[in-house]
Amino acid sequence: MRLSDFYTALRLALVLPFFALYHMSRWVVMYFPAANVGRVVSIASVLLFLFIACTDFLDGYYARKSGKYSSFGKVFDPFADVIANVTVMLCLVADNFMPVFLFLCILYREFGMMFLRMLACGEGHVVGAQRMGKLKTASYMGAVLFSLLLKALYAFELAGADWYERMRAVGRLVYVVPVVLALASFFSYLKTFFPILKRVCGRTRYPVCKTCREWD
């Protein structure tokens, strides 16, 4: 296994531990009401997320350093990004840090990208992450980190309740930026996939799809 693929696999492996850690405080309180683990959990969640974000940087760094880009890595890296980002955002939706509507916009965008990638693979093409896609992922991580740090500040009583609620409202607006970049990157990817869509939709076994032929 290449070192870049190892870091991608590590990122994927840390997703469920993050989910469990994020919800640990409420699970512990259910069985041990006197326990107060909120501070430990909040700071540990921030640190684990930062490590997950570092693996995203490291896999790209070592791939560029070695100059070796495998078809597997081109598919595996964006797949791990999707699983990690969607799982972390789901945690924040549960705590009302992220609006459900914005989460659904991102989720549907990722489903759309998965469909396009599968379609491309069926045609023998592997399309890796583009610069716009990486920018989108960076905006995901920035918005998530803002929410996690805000939660940690409140857990350590470094933020008052009024200020905390105001910043939570600001945090919800912050997620508009990742959604805009996600949609922009989706349309950017469509330009790459367009020749493949034309070829697939132009076949007689797909007679119902005329849209691509009409775009000639």
Curated annotation (Swiss-Prot):
Protein's UniProt name: CDP-diacylglycerol--glycerol-3-phosphate 3-phosphatidyltransferase
Cell location: Cell membrane
Organism: Treponema pallidum (strain Nichols)
Similarity annotation: Belongs to the CDP-alcohol phosphatidyltransferase class-I family.
Coiled-coil positions: none
GO biological process: one example: phosphatidylglycerol biosynthetic process
Membrane-traversing stretches: 40-60, 88-108, 141-161, 176-196
Membrane topology per record: Multi-pass membrane protein
Keyword field contains rRNA-binding: no
NCBIfam families documented for this protein: pgsA
Function, as annotated: This protein catalyzes the committed step to the synthesis of the acidic phospholipids.
Pfam families for this protein: CDP-OH_P_transf (PF01066)
Pathways involved: Phospholipid metabolism; phosphatidylglycerol biosynthesis; phosphatidylglycerol from CDP-diacylglycerol: step 1/2
Reaction(s) catalysed by this chain's protein: a CDP-1,2-diacyl-sn-glycerol + sn-glycerol 3-phosphate = a 1,2-diacyl-sn-glycero-3-phospho-(1'-sn-glycero-3'-phosphate) + CMP + H(+)
A single cellular component GO annotation: plasma membrane
